Regions:
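A glycine/serine/threonine-rich, flexible loop-to-helix segment
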Residues: 95-117, 156
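PG/GG-rich flexible active-site loop of Rossmann-like NAD(P)H-dependent oxidoreductases
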Residues: 52-53, 89-99, 118, 123, ...
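Conserved loop-to-helix N-cap of the C-terminal "lid" that shapes the substrate pocket in Rossmann-like
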Residues: 89, 108-111, 120-130
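Catalytic loop of short-chain dehydrogenase/reductase
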Residues: 10-14, 18-33, 39-83, 94-95, ...
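Rossmann-fold scaffold of SDR-type NAD(P)-dependent oxidoreductases
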Residues: 1-4, 48, 88-92
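C-terminal substrate-recognition "lid" of short-chain dehydrogenase/reductases
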Residues: 122-149, 154
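Conserved Rossmann-fold SDR core element
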Residues: 72, 81-97, 142-149
Length: 156
């Protein structure tokens, strides 16, 4: 997931203020949609980003899974209200970004372990996520859906 703070770790030990702050991403998205939709042309579209844990969470991912799930359900809930304008979600899996640190060896080891069981056993790239976003931007017949860009992580 992108944007906002991210609480991680076991839910029962998680700082609830951090968990609550994780939802800043959702509130930001709802504000963008609510205030921005009226400025879109009828063939305009909005793309939000969730994350694979929204539909397949691992231990320690309660916050990111909850927020991502809320983002995806929000999109499904408002799609009919926005039509003919379109709104979709792109859901990345593990993506190789500086968020995972600057030490190349440690980063490669961590990403390798995190993606070893993917159907495509590697981390994705920011460019691959951008291609997923551009797909839903360009395809005028796609609305109210979630596109996974996760190397098959959600199915593995």
């Amino acid at each position: 997931a992108t944007g906002g703070e991210r609480a991680a770790g076991p839910f029962l030990q998680m700082d609830l203020a951090g968990y609550r702050a994780s939802f800043d991403k959702l509130w930001g998205y709802t504000n963008v949609v609510r205030l921005g939709a009226e400025h879109l042309s009828d063939d305009g579209n909005i793309v939000l980003v969730s994350g694979a844990p929204a539909r397949r969470a691992k231990p320690g991912q309660a916050a990111i899974a909850s927020v991502g799930g809320a983002v995806e359900q929000f999109v499904r809930a408002v799609t009919a209200e926005l039509a003919p304008k379109r709104i979709n979600v792109v859901s990345p899996g593990v993506i190789d970004t500086p968020m995972f640190g600057n030490d190349a060896d440690a980063r490669a080891k961590m990403l390798g372990g995190a993606t070893a069981n993917n159907l495509i056993p590697r981390a994705g790239t920011p460019e691959e996520v951008a291609e997923g976003i551009m797909f839903v931007v360009k395809n005028g017949f796609v609305t109210g859906t979630t596109i996974d860009v996760d190397g098959g992580w959600i199915l593995s």
